[in-house]
């Protein structure tokens, strides 16, 4: 019996360093499952159901400050990109929940005068008042939540269609305590609920986040 055979027999059942390296290399070459972007903390008392919702996190919370002491404004928009047989827009229901942490309990309000760079009103190219009034709810852990359902135009149907929705929000500081510093708040995360009735068929979606980040755009006029 050769020395190599004795060595192999003496260490039967024990992997060699070479075999361990080979196994590690083989494991590294295996296809990895897609990484899931799961937020560190999810709200437990949100008014939206878990099913059918997409948790859209902006990563680092966005902090905005008021330069005139009145309030600040931002624009949140998302694009829906669906493909399916004879999708009816009225079959699609959207909800959003904004998690906002203000520096103190101010008054929230919706704005209806936000326009795009070329002067067109946002939200389907129509005035913002097409959106029903949002309902704000206090959230002890996450500040405040705005919930609304984005309406769609009845009768429109296409096999493939793309529409962009946008919501303009204003944080009003009418209740600012006397002598306090310029108010600010942190824009944390957004819940987006997407629903479609069964007849809409299989759907694919793309959600993008757009925020106004220029101080001039955020000032309330």
From Swiss-Prot:
The yes or no answer to whether the keyword RNA-binding is present is yes
Tell me the InterPro entries matching this sequence.
Coat_Ilarvirus (IPR002681)
Keywords assigned by UniProt? Acetylation, Capsid protein, Ribonucleoprotein, RNA-binding, T=3 icosahedral capsid protein, Viral nucleoprotein, Virion
Does the record carry Acetylation as a key word? yes
> What terms describe the molecular function in GO for this protein?
RNA binding
What is the top-level taxon of the source organism?
A: Viruses
**Mind telling me which GO cellular component terms the entry cites?**
ribonucleoprotein complex; T=3 icosahedral viral capsid; viral nucleocapsid
In the record, N-acetylserine modifications are located at: 2
Q: Where is this region: Disordered?
A: 1-24
In this UniProt entry, which cysteines form S-S bonds? none
Protein localization: Virion
What does this gene product do?
Capsid protein. Binds to the to the 3' end of the nonpolyadenylated viral RNA and is involved in viral RNA translation initiation. Probably binds RNA and plays a role in packaging.
Q: Which family does it belong to?
A: Belongs to the alphamovirus/ilarvirus capsid protein family.
**Protein name, UniProt field:** Capsid protein
Question: Organism, per UniProt?
Answer: Alfalfa mosaic virus
